[in-house]
Amino acid sequence: FSSRRRHTRSFHVTGVQTCALPICKGWRLLVAIADVSHYVQTGSAIDIDAYDRATSVYFPRRVIPMLPEKLSNGLCSLNPHVDRLCMVCDMLIDAQGELEAYQFYPAVMHSHARFTYTEVAAILSNTRGPQALARAERVDDLIHLHDLYRALLGARQRRGAMDFETTETQIVCDENGRIDKIVPRVRNDAHRLIEEAMLIANCCSADFILQAKHPGLFRVHEGPTPEKLELLRSYLKALGLPLTVSDDPAPSEFQAIAKATEGRPDVQQIHTMLLRSMQQAIYTPINSGHFGLAFEAYTHFTSPIRRYPDLLVHRVIKAILAKKRYELPQLPTPGEAHAKFSRRLAQRGRAPAASTGKGKAAATQSAWEAAGLHCSANERRADEASKDVEAWLKCKFMRDHLGEEYSGVVSSVTSFGLFVTLDSLYVEGLIHITELGGEYFRFDEVRQELRGERTGMRYAIGTRVRIQVSRVDLDGRKIDFRLEIGRAHV
């Protein structure tokens, strides 16, 4: 590995190797990612299997990895105090958090320390506390990285990138695999600083591929469709908010709404509606930017252990550095997920663009389009599998709570009833419209509410209710609630 650079002043925070060095009027940020492509050769048996999976799949108690454990937890895990091969994105960032220059190169990493997010957050919150004293030799490094994070965050806010308030949860299981509790995920500055470092490295990767005019996969997130925009405008108007969105909105318009609604009791519901107006991000060789992050070009570089598109990006970057062209491996036989995702895109008017040109160039473009479709489809399949398992576990958990009463908030309104998320359990169930009393309720799609024709009683997103758990369908992954009449308010 004599051609590789060596980096020893670094530390490891659960998966990403980082080093922020203060320089005159800014920082030099190094993001080092395990060089999976060195071990997983194009077209090898491991590569074919990884391509077929396209992603790791995460369940509450188990992970189905994209790569064998000897790689993912061994040679490709950036463990402390051992040499590891990596790909480095080496960046110069000015005092305002703006990217000035970058370069990519293979390197050998020797990490000096591994931190958990909790440790880093504790040190940053109290640089003279017990955790900081125990890691005194690394405190300055963390402070520099935190200063850089704040500069990057400022640049992100000026760019107008979206940042919504939503509650993500995680299932904590006991030793028998049953749910012990469901708790909200807590994000602190340690999570955010690693996130910002990864975002800027991903942005550099996309720019590097574009500048080289080499085919590759981009992570594309398009703006809302006209139909969703109109629905969102009507919803905001119904709430009496003075803000709206234009026909060709910028991400900053959505972020302005998010900022203006901070502190409102229905802030999470408003932010949920903003998110629902968005399209899903996909992998495609046709770059059209990332709407949510407000990047003109974006891709995935930072997780080649668990995402095949990242592995492809590493290979493309290496090919560009070597002044070569990267040729895709044989695409696995398209399966059910591929066909399902193709139909979904076609229904939304986002079918993959037909290749233009002739001969090898057109064939290459078609191959990359097929790769993007395959990886996007398998990403959706993995997400759906994870949600299905979580739904089953939640149903199993709620069977032990039949007949019990809980408080909750309406999280979604449909023509057939209300979906309610329970306060303490973070479990969602349905109050069917027939459980709302003896009168007729009309669904108002604009206001996202059900309104009683006789009494005018309204149930909207954000309405607080008291419910009783009435039925659990384990096979159907459904939980039904019964409304405690007279115990709801907006």
Predicted regions span which residues?
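Short nucleic-acid-contacting surface segments enriched for D/E, G, S/T with interspersed K/R
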Residues: 401, 441-467
